[in-house]
From Swiss-Prot:
Residues modified as N-methylmethionine: M30
Modification after translation (UniProt): Cleaved by prepilin peptidase. Methylated by prepilin peptidase at the amino group of the N-terminal phenylalanine once the leader sequence is cleaved by prepilin peptidase.
Family: Belongs to the GSP H family.
Residues forming coiled coils: none
Propeptide part(s) removed at maturation, as residue ranges: 1-29
Originating species: Xanthomonas campestris pv. campestris (strain ATCC 33913 / DSM 3586 / NCPPB 528 / LMG 568 / P 25)
Protein name per the record: Type II secretion system protein H
Major location category of this protein: membrane
Record carries keyword Glycoprotein: no
Cellular compartments annotated: Cell inner membrane
Length: 169
C-alpha cells in the first residue's frame, strides 16, 4: 500500500512550505573548479620547464635527433651511405627521402663535425654508413640560458639527445 505524501503546511499559512536543501554544488561550479585547477597546473608546468621557449628547444632537439636516427636507419636499410645536413645560419636541416625542416628563429644553432663530409663551409653534415657507423658530430641548440645537445657517435652512429646542464657558478 502506498501512502501519498502531502506537502507540509505552515501552521499559520495555507500554502505548502518549500524546503531548500543546500547539500551539494552545481555542475557549473564543479566545472569552474576543474578549469581553475587545470589552469593552475598549466601555469606551474610552464614556469617549471622554461615555458614556451623551453618547449620549442625540446621540440627542435627531439626532431633533429629523430631525423638523425631516420638517416641512420635509411643507410642500414638501403646499404648506401646517407647524409644529414644542417645549416646553422639558416636554421634548416635536410635528411634523406625529402625530409627537411626549419628551426625556430629564437634558437642559436651550432654544429661541430668532420669537415671532410661538408659540401659547404657554412653547412654541417653527418654521414651514416651501411654498417650504422657515422662520421659523428654534435649539434648544440641554445635559447636564452637553456641548451640542448644532440650527439652522434662516430663508431656506432648512436644518436643521443638531451638537455645540457651548465654548472652553476
Amino acid at each position: 500500500m502506498r501512502v501519498a505524501r502531502l506537502p507540509l503546511l505552515h501552521p499559520h499559512r495555507a500554502a505548502p512550505v518549500v524546503r531548500r536543501q543546500l547539500r551539494g554544488s552545481s555542475l557549473l561550479e564543479m566545472l569552474l573548479v576543474i578549469a581553475l585547477i587545470a589552469l593552475a597546473g598549466v601555469l606551474a608546468a610552464a614556469a617549471l620547464t622554461g615555458g614556451i621557449d623551453g618547449m620549442r628547444l625540446r621540440s627542435a632537439g627531439k626532431a633533429i635527433a629523430a631525423q638523425l636516427r631516420y638517416t641512420r636507419t635509411q643507410a642500414i636499410a638501403t646499404g648506401t651511405p646517407q647524409r644529414f645536413l644542417i645549416d646553422p645560419q639558416q636554421r634548416r636541416w635536410e635528411a634523406p627521402g625529402g625530409h627537411h625542416g626549419d628551426l625556430p628563429a629564437a634558437l642559436e644553432v651550432r654544429f661541430t663535425g668532420a669537415r671532410q663530409v661538408q659540401s659547404r663551409q657554412d653547412q654541417g653534415a653527418i654521414q651514416f654508413f651501411a654498417d650504422g657507423a657515422s662520421t659523428g658530430g654534435r649539434i648544440d641548440l641554445t635559447i636564452k640560458d637553456a641548451r640542448w645537445r644532440v650527439d652522434v657517435g662516430w663508431i656506432t652512429g648512436e644518436v643521443r639527445s638531451g638537455p645540457l646542464r651548465t654548472p652553476a657558478p
